[in-house]
A protein has these predicted regions:
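Metal-dependent nuclease catalytic cores that hydrolyze phosphodiester bonds in DNA/RNA
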Residues: 1-148, 257-258, 262
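Short acidic (Asp/Glu) and glycine-rich catalytic loops that position anionic groups and cofactors
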Residues: 30-35, 166-171, 213-218
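Secondary-structure boundary elements
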Residues: 119-124, 155-161, 196-204
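Conserved catalytic cores of phosphodiester-cleaving nucleases, focusing on short active-site segments
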Residues: 130, 149-177
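Short histidine-centered catalytic/ligand-binding loop motif
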Residues: 40-42, 91-98, 172-183, 225-227
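Hydrophobic/aromatic-lined pockets within catalytic cores
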Residues: 57-62, 166-169, 196-200, 244
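Metal-dependent nuclease catalytic regions and adjoining charged, substrate-binding loops involved
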Residues: 178-185, 190-269
Length: 269
């Protein structure tokens, strides 16, 4: 096995397997995980913006084929603006459409990343592959569990996986809060495991490059502490157990939701 390249994001997301993203839903409950699979929602504006920034930094050669920039159109708040926007989108099927102002802001965000000496070294140069995909299986409770991961950047030269995040606040305090809120630590546990399983590479470092989508587009580079990553590994193992439960043919709705018992909550000050 090895990392696979040139796999489109849509094809990757269609594969049913345990990933850092699906683990977030599973850790809430298997029922929430199954609902997330059944009800695919359109990406939010921040998610779309993040996708564009990723392409500008990691795959600039794909931008023209995947994105389109609207010419100056009337406001979408007007009927004429909505109609003209709909016509433009229909003329660019399969592309993510942005207004010029948003596209330029994304370009400035990407430029800020590449102006950071550390980030530029991580994302460019020999031994760098971007948007690489890994598939593998592991045995959990006597069941084979499919796993998958999509790495923003694997820098073989430096022996590290680097994940690019757009953030509201990329200061140490602000990004630490985002790590807690969005469970980013699961990636720090899951992605190095992917390289170990598909390529036999151990002791891989995992870093985040966080960039603010608004001026002045601050950039921070972060590595999680060992204790946080170990907790995330335990959570991924628990998510694998829950994945097996979610896909068990005899599982009922009552088995997959929250515990049907009184749970004591301890609330800190």
């Amino acid at each position: 096995m090895a990392l696979e390249l040139n796999i489109e994001a849509d094809r990757y997301h269609e594969v049913v397997a345990l990933s850092a993203s699906t683990a977030k839903h599973l850790l809430r409950s298997p029922a929430h995980y199954l609902m997330s699979k059944a009800e695919q929602t359109d990406p939010s504006l921040p998610m779309r913006f993040g996708t564009l920034v990723h392409a500008l930094v990691l795959e600039p050669h794909t931008v023209s084929s995947k994105f389109a920039v609207e010419p100056g159109l009337p406001s979408r708040k007007t009927k004429a603006g909505r109609e003209m926007a709909a016509e433009f989108e229909a003329a660019h099927p399969g592309k993510m459409v942005f207004d010029l102002e948003t596209f330029q802001r994304a370009q400035r965000t990407a430029d800020a990343v590449m102006s950071n000496k550390l980030a530029r070294d991580y994302f460019t140069g020999p031994g760098v592959v971007t948007e690489a995909t890994a598939y593998w299986t592991e045995t959990v409770n006597n069941s084979l569990v499919p796993h998958k991961a999509r790495l923003d950047c694997w820098n073989e030269r430096l022996g590290m996986v680097v994940d690019l995040k757009t953030a509201q606040d990329s200061s140490p305090e602000g990004f630490a809060a985002a790590v807690r809120t969005y469970k980013y630590a699961l990636q720090a546990a899951h992605y190095p495991r992917a390289l170990e399983m598909v390529a036999g590479i151990k002791d891989v470092r995992f870093l985040f490059v966080a960039v603010e989508g608004e001026p002045p587009h601050g950039v921070g580079v972060y590595e999680l502490d060992a204790e946080t990553v170990e907790v995330a590994r335990q959570q991924m193992r628990r998510a694998a157990d829950l994945f097996v439960r979610a896909h068990h043919p005899s599982a009922s709705a009552a088995d997959l939701g929250y515990a049907q018992e009184i749970v004591q909550l301890k609330i800190g000050a």
